[in-house]
Swiss-Prot record:
GO terms for molecular function: hydrolase activity, acting on carbon-nitrogen (but not peptide) bonds. Residues 40-59 are annotated as: Disordered. Residues 68-243 form the NodB homology domain. Keywords: Signal. Pfam families: Polysacc_deac_1. This is Uncharacterized protein SCO4760.
Length: 249
């Protein structure tokens, strides 16, 4: 897989993740790793940029809330499944789509038509480069460049960012802050090729506030719409519903 702001009633501040260890590289967004390096979760304030005396955006895989909601997130490729697009429209699903310009650019027109049905369009860089280790200027160009694209094509000022492959460093946080990003979004669960959930940490069930990543392009998976339908059944069986991540972060 190339791979809102008032907080709703009952929504508490986002859980903030400040990993003590950098994330290990994933195999790439062409396949979300079944169990990426565990994201150390700790509630607290955003990281402080010692060089500039400013707060850096938190890294989150879970939102602290008492609302019975989980959040469905997709990277580039979801728009290529007409049945998935139809599902979003029919169910008015408030999914979050993280977009890379060089991948999703040709489908921007189709994506724009999903916004009235609840889809949120957020930042996944211009070119899907792995950011960790790149100089500040390079990371800033990737993130701010896509901010400009999203603003010019959709009129949206994205404030959520998913780093390609889930890898980042402190320079990423600084560059993201420069570009107006308020949170880096990872995931606590992924949907595998068979429609089952795999968890990066904690017990193996969904909890209110969990962020779920769905790989649109898994090479051996059933079509995206069918997997999403099965996931929705699991969510409903656990007494949960899909929330709009943009409203909680």
């Amino acid at each position: 897989m190339r791979r809102g702001r008032s907080r709703p009633a009952g929504a508490a501040p986002a859980a903030l993740l400040l990993p003590l260890l950098l994330l290990l590289p994933l195999t790439g967004c062409d396949r979300l790793a079944a169990a990426p390096a565990e994201h150390a979760a700790a509630a607290g304030d955003p990281a402080q940029d010692a060089d500039r005396g400013r707060r850096l955006p938190p890294v989150v895989d879970h939102v602290r809330t008492d609302d019975p909601v989980v959040f469905l997130t997709y990277d580039d490729g979801a728009e290529r499944d007409p049945a998935f697009v139809g599902l979003i429209r029919e169910r008015r699903l408030p999914v979050t789509l993280f977009l890379t310009d060089t991948v999703a650019g040709p489908a921007y027109g189709d994506l724009a038509r999903l916004r009235p049905f609840g889809a949120s369009l957020q930042n996944h860089t211009l070119d899907h480069r792995s950011l960790r280790g790149l100089p500040h200027a390079g990371q800033r160009a990737e993130i701010c460049g896509q901010q400009t694209k999203l603003r010019s094509r959709f009129g949206v000022r994205a404030h959520l960012f998913r780093p390609p492959h889930g890898t980042y460093d402190t320079t990423t946080l600084r560059a993201a802050a420069d570009c107006g990003i308020t949170a880096l979004v990872l995931w606590r669960a992924t949907l595998d090729a068979d429609g089952a959930l795999t968890y990066t940490r904690g017990d193996h069930r969904l909890h209110p506030g969990d962020i779920v990543a769905v790989d649109p392009d898994h090479p051996t998976a059933a079509n995206l719409a069918a997997r999403t339908e099965r996931l929705l059944e699991t969510i409903e069986e656990q007494g949960l519903r899909v929330g709009n991540l943009e409203n909680y972060l």
